[in-house]
Amino acid sequence: MAFVLSLLMALVLVSYGPGGSLGCYLSRRLMLDARENLRLLDRMNRLSPHSCLQDRKDFGLPQEMVEGDQLQKDQAFPVLYEMLQQSFNLFYTEHSSAAWDTTLLEQLCTGLQQQLDHLDTCRGQVMGEKDSELGKMDPIVTVKKYFQGIHDYLQEKGYSDCAWEIVRVEMMRALTSSTTLQKRLTKMGGDLNSP
């Protein structure tokens, strides 16, 4: 009986360690997926951005919030998650299917979904009871407004090729910022369960 109890205790301790399945660490895989998504977005370029200069718009990327030190660790994870979720939602539509090479678009959506899946394993552990407050956080509201502006712009421009090209370039900026945020979270310790 003592042996079984010792074995169970050891199993619990290992589960919560860096190599355990219950710890919530930002993995190297997450960063590799992020880089691959940026590479795919770059390959999706169909038009010269210079030919679409008349369609340029400042969407108000909250770059200083994402890349600066404004976010606390408990805010950084939900912001990262929301940015990836909104990016996925933007590209996983009928309108985007008509605008892009289907293979590249599917690969991008799969890559974004893989990042979200990895973060989903952490989400419940990190957010816990705070999840109900997620939609009320100012940084989350800022991210949602940013993406709503992108959706509104596309609709206003009739989902034209130039509008999508402007959005593609903007999404490269946004995903680069989210990658910077991932790196910041990793520097904060990577373990999203710690304070």
Swiss-Prot record:
Residues 1-23 form the signal peptide. CDD domains: IFab. GO terms for cellular component: extracellular space. Constitutively and exclusively expressed in the mononuclear cells of the extraembryonic trophectoderm. It comes from the Eukaryota. The gene is IFNT7. Gene3D superfamilies: 1.20.1250.10. GO terms for biological process: defense response to virus; female pregnancy. It comes from Ovis aries. This is Interferon tau-7. Paracrine hormone primarily responsible for maternal recognition of pregnancy. Interacts with endometrial receptors, probably type I interferon receptors, and blocks estrogen receptor expression, preventing the estrogen-induced increase in oxytocin receptor expression in the endometrium. This results in the suppression of the pulsatile endometrial release of the luteolytic hormone prostaglandin F2-alpha, hindering the regression of the corpus luteum (luteolysis) and therefore a return to ovarian cyclicity. It is found in: Secreted. PROSITE patterns: INTERFERON_A_B_D.
